[in-house]
From Swiss-Prot:
Protein name: Probable conjugal transfer protein TrbB
Alphabetized PANTHER family for the sequence: TWITCHING MOTILITY PROTEIN PILT (PTHR30486), TYPE IV PILUS RETRACTATION ATPASE PILT (PTHR30486:SF6)
InterPro entries cross-referenced by the UniProt entry: Conjug-transfer_TrbB, P-loop_NTPase, T2SS/T4SS_dom, T4SS_GSP_E_ATPase
Molecular functions (GO terms): ATP binding; ATP hydrolysis activity
Ranges that cross the membrane: none
Binding positions for ATP per the UniProt entry: 151-158
Primary site of residence: cytoplasm
Keyword terms of this UniProt record: ATP-binding, Conjugation, Cytoplasm, Nucleotide-binding, Plasmid, Transport
Species this chain originates from: Sinorhizobium fredii (strain NBRC 101917 / NGR234)
SUPFAM superfamilies membership: P-loop containing nucleoside triphosphate hydrolases
Length: 325
């Protein structure tokens, strides 16, 4: 980022390669994702409209985009290292670029960084969640319960996490938040907050250990991906309740199994009881042809007699028919 700020020529080169259409799309708060396929076809996903064709881009322009991003990230991308991952220097959007031989022709995806905060009330108005579900989330925040937000790819986990964090700041403005991410996606307006980022040399587990010395009231993790899940559970369980994290899992109950898998990467001892004790609420959000919706919310009571004791607020068929978001 600093390198690019000091070299406006790189910015201009990237803008020229992207073209006016994609530069405008990156400024559009309704845009979720920009996708270029190896055949040169472009697709753009917009809130409320889904994915739609958006013209084409030449292989030369795509290769220039990927190369310019790699240059800005002080990385190399070529046939030996054909994949580049990082943040697009314009706007900090998430970028994934690929070159042959892993693809036939240059391809990339840009996940636009959300610039618009969607409050829980808007989720209710648009039918993404019910008033009862919003009330459950607010009650969990007020009670300093630990909340996991689960969902598949592009389901809206981070956007919902931002809404939950907004509620935390509103209800407990005195709390000090420490937020840990791999890529900058979390929005936090708290007066007392520390944002930490992983790097090539500092992983999430190391950041979590450092977090314990930063006197957090609440610990937020952008996405739990690996054995750092165990470190997070320990942090939440040692005087830092009321945290938020997202996890890649299609349902609320499968999020518990996913946590088991992740903690197993760091410990040979099963962590069922720890998970049952520390995780309080799991909110599952999904993307459907009709839009995103909170599929279910489960409250985790404990792990006993070989199973998790939970209370579930699952989307019923009647509510599913009414869903129009």
């Amino acid at each position: 980022m600093e390198q690019l700020r000091s070299h406006p020529r790189l910015v201009r080169k990237l803008q020229e390669a992207l073209g006016d259409q994609l530069c405008v799309a990156l400024d559009d708060s309704n845009v979720v994702e920009i996708m270029l396929n190896p055949d040169g076809k472009l697709f753009i996903e917009r809130l409320g409209h889904g994915v739609a064709p958006a013209g084409e881009m030449s292989s030369a322009a795509a290769e220039m985009v990927i190369g310019t991003v790699a240059h800005a990230l002080q990385s190399e991308v070529d046939t030996e290292q054909p994949i580049i991952s990082g943040e697009l220097p314009i706007g900090g959007h998430r970028f994934e670029g690929l070159l042959p031989p892993v693809v036939a022709k240059p391809s990339f995806t840009i996940r636009r960084r959300a610039s618009r905060l969607i409050p829980l009330d808007d989720y209710v108005r648009s039918g993404v969640m019910t008033e009862a579900q919003a009330a459950t989330i607010r009650s969990a925040i007020d009670s300093r319960l630990n909340i996991i937000i689960s969902g598949g790819t592009a389901s809206g986990k981070t956007t919902l996490a931002n809404a939950v964090i907004h509620e935390i700041v509103r209800s407990a403005p005195e709390d000090r938040l420490v937020i840990l991410e791999d890529t900058a996606e979390i929005q936090c307006a708290a007066d007392n907050a520390v944002l930490l980022r992983t790097s090539d040399t500092v992983d999430m587990a190391r950041l979590l250990k450092s977090t314990m010395r930063l006197r957090p009231d609440r610990i937020v993790v952008g996405e739990v991906r690996d054995g750092a899940a165990l470190t997070l559970l320990k942090a939440w369980n040692t005087g830092h309740p009321g945290g938020v994290a997202t996890i890649h899992s299609n349902t609320a109950t499968s999020a518990l199994r996913r946590l088991e898998q992740l903690t197993a990467e760091a410990s040979q001892q099963p962590m069922h009881e720890v998970i049952g004790e520390v995780v309080d609420l799991i909110v599952s959000i999904e993307r459907t042809p009709r839009g995103r919706r909170v599929r279910d919310i489960i409250q985790v009571e404990r792990f006993a007699n070989g199973r998790y004791e939970i209370e579930s607020d699952q989307l019923t068929e009647e509510r599913e028919e009414r869903h129009v978001a």
